[in-house]
Amino acid sequence: MWLYLAVLLGLYYLLRWFRERQVVSHLQDKFVFITGCDSGFGNQLARQLDLRGLRVLAGCLTEQGAEQLRNQTSDRLQTVILDVTKTESIAAATEWVKECVGDRGLWGLVNNAGIFHSHGYAEWIKIETYRDTLRVNLIGVIEVTLSMLPLVRKAQGRIVNVSSILGRIAFFGAVYSCSKYGVEAFSDILRRELQHFGVKVSMVEPGYFRTAMTDWQKFSEIMKQIWKETPAHIKETYGQKFFDAYHDLMKQGLLSCSTNLNLVTDCMEHALTSVHPRTRYSAGWDAQFFFVPLSYLPTSLADYILTRSWPKPAQAV
């Protein structure tokens, strides 16, 4: 019985491996638009796809980021300034992309731009921070996608949305997790609604990686500032000892982030270039072998595993 199941499982993975190795033809004629290319995953993906021969259209927040990217890539790569929180910026970028791609349409749209404001417990964070994060990480994804969707549909192309393992299992960073759960839901709906148009939608769910968003020094400074601005009655509820212990816990986690960004960008590239892309990509060993399996456990068991090492607030019962 077990041998039979093992053989079936082996055949399944062999078939999946074979299907996923099939590459889309004429990649050199495909246009891919990527948001958030100033640094991090977006910057690396832009350079990676440029080396592969694709026609990369890179959305950057700053002219400095755009210039640095152009200096590191071939003449094929083009840049545009894009602020995903501004409707007029998205509209202008869409018109620019339309002119670039012509009648071919847009093969790939990668929604990568994001911010990371997860520097404390949920009630420490100001409501403005929740709004700002959702405006970039969720509303920005939705608005860019809806604006460029006709171009993607014309090419029967791909949409790749960068979520997070915190969009699969929420245990830290209420602000960020809320935005990424929204990206997951939006992507699932898009995938089902667009299947009849030949458009494929994938999500990439990275674990912990070292980028500008997870730089410990900057993270620590913001975290201390947030704690300083937290109302006194809330600070009394948790206590300074709790904050110090929580601060050290965050330090351990962020300093252990993976530096191999290719684990993420390779997933993005596969979603854009494979004939049979996956629906979800869990990027990083922590995501694949800890957080994703954890997400399938009973909630009470997952809660225990995740929080057993957390410090206790001063007024805990």
Swiss-Prot record:
GO terms for cellular component: endoplasmic reticulum membrane; intracellular membrane-bounded organelle. The keyword Phosphoprotein does not apply. GO terms for biological process: brexanolone catabolic process; retinol metabolic process; steroid metabolic process. PROSITE patterns: ADH_SHORT. Its EC number is 1.1.1.105, 1.1.1.209, 1.1.1.239, 1.1.1.53. Disulfide bonds: none annotated. Residues 1-17 form the signal peptide. Keywords: Endoplasmic reticulum, Glycoprotein, Lipid metabolism, Membrane, Microsome, NAD, Oxidoreductase, Signal, Steroid metabolism. It is found in: Microsome membrane; Endoplasmic reticulum membrane. One of its GO terms (molecular function) is androstan-3-alpha,17-beta-diol dehydrogenase (NAD+) activity. It is a peripheral membrane protein. Glycans are attached at N71, N161. The keyword Cell wall biogenesis/degradation does not apply. Substrate binds at S164. InterPro entries: NAD(P)-bd_dom_sf, Sc_DH/Rdtase_CS, SDR_fam. It catalyses: all-trans-retinol--[retinol-binding protein] + NAD(+) = all-trans-retinal--[retinol-binding protein] + NADH + H(+); all-trans-retinol + NAD(+) = all-trans-retinal + NADH + H(+); androsterone + NAD(+) = 5alpha-androstan-3,17-dione + NADH + H(+); testosterone + NAD(+) = androst-4-ene-3,17-dione + NADH + H(+). NAD-dependent oxidoreductase with broad substrate specificity that shows both oxidative and reductive activity (in vitro). Has 17-beta-hydroxysteroid dehydrogenase activity towards various steroids (in vitro). Converts 5-alpha-androstan-3-alpha,17-beta-diol to androsterone and estradiol to estrone (in vitro). Has 3-alpha-hydroxysteroid dehydrogenase activity towards androsterone (in vitro). Has retinol dehydrogenase activity towards all-trans-retinol (in vitro). Can convert androsterone to epi-androsterone. Belongs to the short-chain dehydrogenases/reductases (SDR) family. This is 17-beta-hydroxysteroid dehydrogenase type 6. The lineage of its organism: Eukaryota, Metazoa, Chordata, Craniata, Vertebrata. The gene is HSD17B6.
